[in-house]
Amino acid sequence: MTQKTTLVLLALAVITIFALVCVLLAGRSGDGGGLSQPLHCPSVLPSVQPRTHPSQSQPFADLSPEELTAVMSFLTKHLGPGLVDAAQARPSDNCVFSVELQLPAKAAALAHLDRGGPPPVREALAIIFFGGQPKPNVSELVVGPLPHPSYMRDVTVERHGGPLPYYRRPVLDREYQDIEEMIFHRELPQASGLLHHCCFYKHQGQNLLTMTTAPRGLQSGDRATWFGLYYNLSGAGFYPHPIGLELLIDHKALDPALWTIQKVFYQGRYYESLTQLEDQFEAGLVNVVLVPNNGTGGSWSLKSSVPPGPAPPLQFHPQGPRFSVQGSQVSSSLWAFSFGLGAFSGPRIFDIRFQGERVAYEISVQEAIALYGGNSPASMSTCYVDGSFGIGKYSTPLIRGVDCPYLATYVDWHFLLESQAPKTLRDAFCVFEQNQGLPLRRHHSDFYSHYFGGVVGTVLVVRSVSTLLNYDYIWDMVFHPNGAIEVKFHATGYISSAFFFGAGEKFGNRVGAHTLGTVHTHSAHFKVDLDVAGLKNWAWAEDMAFVPTIVPWQPEYQMQRLQVTRKLLETEEEAAFPLGGATPRYLYLASNHSNKWGHRRGYRIQILSFAGKPLPQESPIEKAFTWGRYHLAVTQRKEEEPSSSSIFNQNDPWTPTVNFTDFISNETIAGEDLVAWVTAGFLHIPHAEDIPNTVTAGNSVGFFLRPYNFFDEDPSFHSADSIYFREGQDATACEVNPLACLSQTATCAPEIPAFSHGGFAYRDN
């Protein structure tokens, strides 16, 4: 080969390499050589834009900041100059405790929703503490019309039969602050010697903190609370770190200077005062167990000890979200409803429609309780009635990617509680559609005919989370493509604990050197106002029975034949099923309209719960949550029975403001507007794996509302998410199988928003 030929070939090679480089660079972006950005997924599904929402659902929207401000201004003007900001109010002051939506009457709402009538007047319910009156009391005022109020109406006597005693009021944050001031500045210094010896006591107890219990006393009129003391661990839960000291504080007096310690409990023994405890310690009569301050490391911390790994799976919408959220309204191709948050009762949804037909007027959380046992006074007497604290009030910002899918839609909540101005809880709700990774239904046939058919199991979810002291409750409303609704709550957070001594293992398991995880039950109560093909419904119970039967074709033999039993439940007493008793496996509400096959159109209530035993009725506090006696109860719907509990039941359980058994008065439930009241819960015996805190796995309960002959066939038969192909068809072809198109339809990249957090001190905003 000549030198000239070699040079020509070399030049051609250089040109070829240059051309290849140009081709490669053509696929790169001009932003510094990085790979070209993939196509971003649409944020709105083009085929359903804009999505329509039933504007009639506005009656159920929680109050806006403007409405809350207008109500507060009206109350300030009309209640006089003596009104004090609740954030600073002492027991002897007048203050506005809360302002929230007054739900409209159902008849007025339906007249608007279904018959085009005027929208119900929007009103607010304000709870006022009148501590400065000659006879202190609590009053409930309805204020309206919004957004420009011109009247307020005292409904206390109308709703409760008389004035509400002042001692029933929930405890304000300021009252807790004054109790802590009393404990740490006035009382604990009296036992400083003991506390230095046992618990690394610092000036005014800066390394310690308190946790409240409830109820507060032993009879109506009491306001005496056991407070447990714990190590204050920065960045970690203090709940598993009791020091063994518990104080019974009498804080009934309107003047905090008159509050006293009634009793002291320390590491297994009772004392009359901290002074007596200190004197006996100095005399060598107290057997002190030294409790180390474990700090925030090791298994007590929620901070992982390992570095982050590969990113977990991420769900996204390749062709845009298939639902929309506008204010408090959610709609998809199948479902439409309005959602909200009761400041005390918690999450709720209204006007729930499937394929345009209402199946329920209201599904809402009513109450939650946690009932404890133990051998210390605080643990043995604790029964938290969470509505008094505020299931909505103590909702928390949802953490993107942990509490909800990262790409969920997040919605704020506005509230006015213990303040003179509205505040906002960022990301209080999330709404998302999720592929459950489980088919809704499927069948693969290899017999006679060869085919596959199935429906992708997707659900639409609305979620909120409440952190009530140590526990976090995750509340889910889940909407399935076959018309079923699933309602459930998951418990996580920290266990409550007590100092371990004596026969502590009768009341739980030891989870630390000096820590007893105390046994307890969780129960939640739900209101289910089903409107099955109309307002007039009937309650039916169905079950199974084995009946001895002569074999028809061989009479000398007998068989046990399985058959269905059916019973119409005609009264409230018949439809009240005690917890732990026999409950029909199928209980459903039905209309007098039939499906194509002649069966009454119905919705079944299927409860998934493993609740502990109810508190015996001999207990003097049991009347405060008598709904816990029942697995399920069906009653006539009445406007004067809006809720199964009251925020005033916690601090006077002996004479409860609302007693659920009053709802069960043996009235007829045949052909009436009915409400089903559902209890779901579980027993929790804490164990080592509850440290650092409790997991949701296995700690979830709730119920399903399932179509029962409501349709002529499964409505998901018409789902656009259906997959079907037969032998001989090309299952890899798009026109046969939509999943075969994913390589084309799902090759976009989701818009990943920057991580954000709603903050920790939102109540101080």
From Swiss-Prot:
Range of residues in the leader sequence: none
InterPro entries named among the record's database cross-references: Cu_Am_Ox_Cu-bd, Cu_Am_ox_TPQ-bd, Cu_amine_oxidase, Cu_amine_oxidase_C, Cu_amine_oxidase_C_sf, Cu_amine_oxidase_N-reg, Cu_amine_oxidase_N2, Cu_amine_oxidase_N3
Highest taxon listed in the record's lineage: Eukaryota
Keyword Cell membrane part of the UniProt annotation: yes
Residues binding Ca(2+) 2, per UniProt: 572, 641, 663, 667
Residues forming the catalytic site: 386, 471
Gene Ontology annotations for the cellular component aspect, listed alphabetically: cell surface; early endosome; endoplasmic reticulum; Golgi apparatus; membrane; microvillus; plasma membrane
Cofactor(s) the record lists: Cu(2+); Ca(2+); L-topaquinone
Protein residues bound to Cu(2+): 520, 522, 684
EC number: 1.4.3.21
Glycosylation sites recorded in the entry for this protein: 137, 232, 294, 592, 659, 666
Record-linked Pfam families: Cu_amine_oxid, Cu_amine_oxidN2, Cu_amine_oxidN3
PANTHER family recorded: COPPER AMINE OXIDASE, MEMBRANE PRIMARY AMINE OXIDASE
Protein name in the entry: Amine oxidase [copper-containing] 3
Species per Swiss-Prot/TrEMBL record: Mus musculus
Encoding gene per record: Aoc3
